[in-house]
Every structure is written in structure tokens, then in C-alpha cells.
A protein has these predicted regions:
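Acidic Gly/Asp/Thr-rich repetitive segments characteristic of extracellular carbohydrate-active
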Residues: 42-80
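Parallel beta-helix/beta-solenoid
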Residues: 99, 118-152, 156-175, 192-195, ...
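Short, T/G/N/S-enriched strand-turn elements that build extracellular solenoid repeat scaffolds
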Residues: 60-69, 85-94, 108, 127-130, ...
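N-terminal extracellular ligand-recognition/capping segment immediately after the signal peptide
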Residues: 72-114, 119-122, 144, 172
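Short glycine/acidic-rich loop motifs that flank beta-strands on beta-rich extracellular proteins
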Residues: 86-89, 107-113, 147-155, 176-183, ...
Length: 404
């Protein structure tokens, strides 16, 4: 009898003890409905919170900050499928996968804000050099779009000072007066299986949906110091679709004497573009291959020099080159299928435009020939020019089929 009374008295203590263990083993509850969850490499939940569909940024940013703390190693951040408004740019974190499968995020910033950015001084209080701001980050799936009425001329995604970043299967939609995504000072950054669609109030002069840009503080990539001359290297755009845009992917502007190195644009589909599908400016060791370009104003533009027009060329302030002027492109444009026609932005359609020459005007003095470029195996259907080239040296043009 005494043992029974002892058991009854101790039972609540035993239950409380086991409940405490259960809570300690699972510190965050799963939320029904809209939520964001952070799991570490073992699958343990390290953060979970409900997300307000009208203002998802606070909860999402807290999840990203949990990863950025570094306390849990490489993590996966998952958002419950649904549609959410982002009223402030969310700062991405290193060492994570952000899974947005089934998620639509709407850029609802009151000003020129974005949906996602890499860390910068405004948000972290730090300047970043080289490729140190964001590393080992994957953005998977999801749709990035604009809230109704947002015509503020802002990008959906801006990345700078970043390394080993992959954007996989994400849709970028309905940009007005800007780019869908911008990248500067990136190393081993990949856009694969992405969709870029819908663009208004832009012109051929500066309208790439995916802009591979220069890290210049005043006109092209403000708010991402340090401005240390870091260039893009090993950038890959593969198996993406670009449709109903002004321009597709590439670079307009240049630092004289600095180069975008190792850009690969492969296996993409471009259709119904008013301007140029692929723009290469100061590219070396580049590969442009197996792309399908249909109903566009121009297929591929490759510049090593431009003295006037829309391109911005930046020097050291006294008109001298930054770094060393390159004399070897070491690039190839091969096995592309291109169909071009006259558009509202391109009254003289061309399959390809390859441009080098002696500098004058904006460029420091020198010869910027297109040297050692291979253009072969391309099929071009055009209502205007086929392949137009200026100052091509030691280049190979072979087995290209042009139909008018």
C-alpha cells in the first residue's frame, strides 16, 4: 500500500520530467499554415516561425539570420508553399539551401528594394572584399515577382562579392525599368533551369534580364562596397529560358583593363526579345554555345572595344587602363541556332555583331582587336545581317550557315 501511495505521489514528477525531455529534444514546434523552418544537416529543427503573407520578411530574415550565426553549420531553410509579400529586402546567408518550391514572393518594397540581396554594409555594417560576402548558397525553385503597382525600377535579386552560389529553377517575372537579377564580383555563380519573363519600360541600351555587371559604385552597383576591382569569374547560365523581354543576358559596361573571365552561356532558349539575346563586353575565356535564339532583334554581340554609344567605360580617373589590357579573347561562339528579325528596338537585325578596334573617345588609347575568337557551327536565319565583324585578328569563322 505504501509503495502504491509513493507511486501516485511521484507520477506527476515523472510526467513533468519526460515532458521536459521532449521539449528539449524538439525546441521548435511545426506550424500549420504559412511558416519558415531552418533545419541543420542532421534534419533537426533549429528555428521555426509563422510567416505573415502580407509581410513575410521579418520571419524569413530571422530564419536567414539563424543560419548566418554559424551555430548550426550548413542548413536548409524551407518556406511553406504560398504567396507572400516582401516589404524589405532579405539578406541571404552563407552555407545554406533556401528551398522556395511552390512559393511566390512579391517585391512590395516602397522604394527601390529587392527581394533578396547578398550581405552589404547597409544591412550588416561591414564592407566585403573579393568574394567574401556570400558563399556556398543555393536558391532553389520559387517565383520572384512584383506586387501590383510596384514600378520602382528595382531588381528582384542582387548579388555581389559572392562565391559558389547556385540559383536553380527559379522564375523571375514582370520587371519594369530595371533588370530581373544583377550580379557583380561573383565566382562560380550558376543560374540553371531558370525562367526570365516579362519586361516593360526599358530599351535596348540597358535591359538585360540577367545582368553580369561591373562592381562600380556610382552608376551600376551602388551600396555593395568594397569597390576593390573584383571581377566576375566562372559564371554559368545554363538551360534557362528568356522570353518576352528587351534583352536576355550579359554585360554592357566595362572597366578598361579588367575582364569578365570564364563566362559560360550554354543551352538556353531566347524567344521574342526586342533587342539582343546575349551581350558580351570584355569577356575572355568565354563559351557561348548551343543556345536557341528565336524572333529576336539580335543574337549575340561581342565587344572588346566601344568608343561611343550606351556602354560605360571606367578608367583609373586619369584615362589610363585599370590592370593590364588583354590581347587574347580565348573565347568561342559555337553551335547556336539563331533567328533574328526587325523589332521595335532593332531596325537592323543581325545574327552576330563582333566588334574590336582602335580606341578613341571613352577608351584609353590602344588597339582592342577581337583576337583569338572562334565562331563556328552556328545556324543563322536573318532578315538583315548575318555575322558582322570589325578588327577581327587570328579568329576562326567556319561552318556557319546563314539564310536570308
Amino acid at each position: 500500500m505504501q509503495k502504491m501511495r509513493f507511486f501516485r505521489r511521484c507520477l506527476p514528477l515523472f510526467l513533468a520530467f519526460w515532458l521536459l525531455l521532449a521539449v528539449a529534444g524538439a525546441p521548435f514546434a511545426a506550424y500549420a499554415g504559412e511558416s519558415v523552418t531552418v533545419r541543420d544537416g542532421s534534419g533537426q529543427v533549429r528555428y521555426a516561425a509563422p510567416m505573415d503573407p502580407e509581410n513575410a520578411c521579418p520571419a524569413l530574415q530571422s530564419a536567414l539570420d539563424t543560419v548566418r550565426s554559424g551555430a548550426y553549420g550548413t542548413c536548409t531553410v524551407t518556406v511553406t508553399p504560398g504567396k507572400y509579400r516582401m516589404t524589405k529586402s532579405a539578406v541571404l546567408a552563407s552555407d545554406m539551401t533556401l528551398d522556395l518550391t511552390g512559393v511566390t514572393l512579391l517585391n512590395a518594397n516602397a522604394g527601390k528594394g529587392n527581394i533578396f540581396i547578398s550581405p552589404n554594409r547597409d544591412r550588416t555594417g561591414k564592407d566585403y572584399t573579393g568574394y567574401s560576402a556570400l558563399e556556398n548558397c543555393t536558391l532553389r525553385g520559387g517565383t520572384l515577382d512584383y506586387a501590383p503597382g510596384n514600378t520602382n525600377g528595382s531588381c528582384l535579386l542582387r548579388l555581389a562579392h559572392c562565391k559558389n552560389v547556385t540559383v536553380d529553377g527559379t522564375a523571375f517575372l514582370n520587371n519594369t525599368d530595371s533588370h530581373h537579377a544583377e550580379l557583380a564580383a561573383g565566382y562560380n555563380v550558376r543560374f540553371v533551369n531558370c525562367l526570365f519573363s516579362g519586361q516593360t519600360n526599358q530599351t535596348e541600351s540597358s535591359a538585360e534580364a540577367l545582368q553580369i555587371d561591373i562592381l562600380e559604385k556610382n552608376r551600376h552597383f551602388a551600396n555593395f562596397p568594397a569597390y576593390d576591382g573584383t571581377m566576375n569569374q566562372k559564371i554559368t547560365v545554363e538551360d534557362c529560358t528568356f522570353q518576352d523581354l528587351i534583352c536576355g543576358v550579359g554585360t554592357r559596361n566595362a572597366f578598361a583593363g579588367r575582364y569578365q573571365k570564364g563566362v559560360t552561356i550554354r543551352g538556353n532558349t531566347f524567344r521574342r526579345l526586342q533587342g539582343t539575346a546575349i551581350v558580351c563586353t570584355n569577356y575572355v575565356d568565354a563559351v557561348i554555345e548551343k543556345n536557341t535564339i528565336t524572333d529576336c532583334g539580335r543574337g549575340v554581340a561581342y565587344y572588346m572595344c566601344k568608343n561611343s554609344g550606351v556602354i560605360d567605360v571606367f578608367t583609373d580617373g586619369s584615362g589610363k587602363v585599370l590592370g593590364k589590357r588583354n590581347t587574347d579573347c580565348g573565347s568561342r561562339i559555337t553551335d547556336n541556332t539563331i533567328s533574328v528579325c526587325q523589332t521595335a528596338e532593332m531596325d537592323k537585325p543581325r545574327g552576330m555583331f563582333l566588334y574590336g578596334g582602335k580606341a578613341a573617345g571613352k577608351m584609353p588609347a590602344g588597339n582592342y582587336a577581337v583576337y583569338n575568337l572562334t565562331v563556328s557551327g552556328n545556324t543563322i536565319t536573318t532578315t538583315g545581317g548575318g555575322i558582322t565583324g570589325t578588327d577581327l585578328q587570328n579568329c576562326t569563322l567556319a561552318d556557319n550557315r546563314i539564310t536570308h
